[in-house]
Amino acid sequence: MSTKNFRVSDGDWICPDKKCGNVNFARRTSCNRCGREKTTEAKMMKAGGTEIGKTLAEKSRGLFSANDWQCKTCSNVNWARRSECNMCNTPKYAKLEERTGYGGGFNERENVEYIEREESDGEYDEFGRKKKKYRGKAVGPASILKEVEDKESEGEEEDEDEDLSKYKLDEDEDEDDADLSKYNLDASEEEDSNKKKSNRRSRSKSRSSHSRSSSRSSSPSSSRSRSRSRSRSSSSSQSRSRSSSRERSRSRGSKSRSSSRSHRGSSSPRKRSYSSSSSSPERNRKRSRSRSSSSGDRKKRRTRSRSPESQVIGENTKQP
């Protein structure tokens, strides 16, 4: 069969023998070249495109021939001599890939592998972590635990039974039983009593000297305080005398003012009578108004009532 007239259709298979590699029709059960039977290992062929045929070639008016093929993925029409599509590089004849579903494609969940896990009552779980109920507890057979405890107790007893001579524990007792005559304990007591007496005497002397110095230091301070008190008393007496003199002068001034006012009041009718007799009635009115403005409304009334009387008195005085 010539390669030009060879056409691959769906279902054709390739011989599983690597040396042979012959492409057989889908209807054959054994290889046409080597005679090997068809097995599951044989890879199926898949056509990436189909020939357009004579009808479409005639419609193209000489642009395409009947052997040209159309791609199945992008529907581009390619020449017959091309083994791959000119647009998407899809092969004209390709091997059919096995669809296992592990890559996320078609038939993904058909053959699912389940991992069987057995729940055990052991100390650790499937991830190697210690279970909560076994945390903080010694897990193991009772016999093993007893053996461990027995070994620990035996080790402690052996440690206690070891030779203790190297530690020299009796040296303290020997030191307590030693001769204490060389230390003179009575002499130390006498020295302590003498020291206490001398300390008391020195304290009494220091207190007496301190009292004397304090009395001496207090004497100039007391004299200063006395002088200050005297100066304060003298200043207070002077201020009092000044205040009393001021009060006396003020009282005298007030008395003199009152007496002068009384004298003025007594002499006013005479002056008014003389002035009224000598001056005109207009002047008397002006004077009475000026006096009434200074003394108040009551004085105005008095001056008005007295003005005609003063004129009568003046006339009477003129006549002998």
Curated annotation (Swiss-Prot):
Q: Which domain of life is it from?
A: Eukaryota
| PTM (free text) | Phosphorylated on Ser-310 upon DNA damage, probably by ATM or ATR.
InterPro entries, per database record? Znf_RanBP2, Znf_RanBP2_sf, ZRANB2
Natural source organism: Pongo abelii
Top-down, what is the taxonomic lineage of the species of origin? Eukaryota, Metazoa, Chordata, Craniata, Vertebrata
Keywords, ordered alphabetically: Acetylation, Metal-binding, mRNA processing, mRNA splicing, Nucleus, Phosphoprotein, Repeat, RNA-binding, Zinc, Zinc-finger
Gene name in the database record: ZRANB2
Tell whether Zinc is among the UniProt keywords: yes
- What would be one Gene Ontology cellular-component term for the protein? nucleus
Q: Where does it reside?
A: Nucleus
What is the name of the protein in this document? Answer: Zinc finger Ran-binding domain-containing protein 2
Task: Show the segment(s) annotated as Disordered.
Answer: 117-320
